[in-house]
């Protein structure tokens, strides 16, 4: 029984950040029902979809272009604590399931709207993807190496960090407030806003005069030799994050950088003298190229260098640290990340494998709305659900 056990959530099916929010809530015990399009219903329940982003919740197939289908969603709203939708601004209203209609049915509902640009603004009604949202937020400009083009971070910043994860935080905040006030509200969760929020520390560094807009020249963006990745003798990589003086001293001791420089007749410059960072990166690159990744693990693991091997997804799932912690689990025959964060008394858990669209229509109508078989059959016959 996770910490959100007893909470009921409607997820109007979408892609990316919305499903991630719903997955996080379901992992923590919420009863999440995904409203899928009726015309996409079907699939062999014995062969669940491989998209584990859809794990943990039931699916109801609904025709939102029919009045009866819309009424089904509004009936569900009466029993829900929260609703998540990811349409462009105005679409939910045109369908008849916008905030006004839903809050009229359930004044305590937390209604969360996930978009890239937000509900208003010059870009609000235009298409976009993660790369565009983090570009406008000022985040993408700082990802990549000096002299090279910005590098998209595989949708982690916009869709999932600044999008789905912050929306989940917003929904839980809304639920807590609704418990106190008895009133619901609308959440405008925009990926451009969330991505900007994730940049707060960098804005602080900029205000402090220790960060510039020149990509790849700052301490945390591959500008510094002591905070970077290095190729090893076998073509693999290791990561180094030796920022603090005591950690940097460990890096020097275990890498032999100082001796490497002395052999060339060079002295070791002050760590924070940025004018030497590029030169020292080249020297460290030579050092790390002398051993394989596993050999460097033997040298540095267990120390205070701030070191870790750069692993592929497959390697990460097998690493002893992750295995001991259960960071990854096999569920439904698919290896995937385990629910996070961890609770000592009410831990989260993957509740079920992903459902095909409409796989649980009858079950949801009976469970949430108390319908009998004839009522369910009538809705199916009308085409309102599938």
State where each predicted segment sits.
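Glycine-rich beta-alpha junction loops
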Residues: 117-118, 191-196, 234-236, 242-247, ...
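Conserved Rossmann-fold dehydrogenase catalytic segment
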Residues: 119, 148-158, 179-195, 215-222, ...
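Oxidoreductase and adenylate-handling cofactor-binding alpha/beta cores
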Residues: 137, 163-185, 197-208, 250-259
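Flexible glycine/proline-enriched surface loops and loop-helix/loop-strand junctions
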Residues: 149-158, 231-236, 346-349
